[in-house]
C-alpha cells in the first residue's frame, strides 16, 4: 500500500464507522505502490456495507468523503460485484491484490 494511503488508515477506519461500512479494501496501483503516482493516480477501493438500507445514497456520499479525505479521485466498487463477476481473471487479480483497510 502506498505510504500516502497508509498514513490515513486511522482516518479511513473512522470514516468507515461513520458510513456503516463492514469492509473496505484498497486495490490497484495504490495497493501495489510500485506504479502509484501521488500527483496523478486515483485510489481504487472495494466496499461492503453492513446493511442494504439506503445503500445508493451512502455509496455516493462515501465515495465523495473518501476522495475529500485522500485529496484524489476515488473509484469505489462493491465487493460483492467483484466476487460475483464471471470474469474470473479480473476477479482473481482484484481479490488477490486487495489489501484490507477496515473490517467490522
Identify the role of each PLM range:
Residues 34-35, 39-44:
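A short, structured beta-strand/loop element
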Residues 46-48:
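Short hydrophobic/aromatic beta-strand micro-patches
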Residues 1-25, 31-36, 50-104:
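Catalytic core of pol beta-like nucleotidyltransferases
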Amino acid at each position: 500500500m502506498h505510504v500516502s494511503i497508509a498514513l490515513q488508515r486511522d482516518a479511513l477506519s473512522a470514516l468507515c464507522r461513520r458510513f456503516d461500512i463492514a469492509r473496505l479494501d484498497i486495490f490497484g496501483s495504490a495497493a501495489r505502490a510500485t506504479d502509484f503516482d501521488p500527483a496523478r493516480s486515483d485510489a481504487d477501493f472495494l466496499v461492503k456495507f453492513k446493511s442494504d438500507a439506503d445503500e445508493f445514497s451512502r455509496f455516493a456520499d462515501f465515495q465523495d468523503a473518501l476522495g475529500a479525505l485522500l485529496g484524489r479521485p476515488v473509484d469505489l466498487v462493491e465487493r460483492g460485484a467483484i466476487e460475483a463477476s464471471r470474469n474470473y481473471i479480473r476477479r482473481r487479480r482484484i481479490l488477490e491484490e486487495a489489501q484490507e483497510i477496515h473490517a467490522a
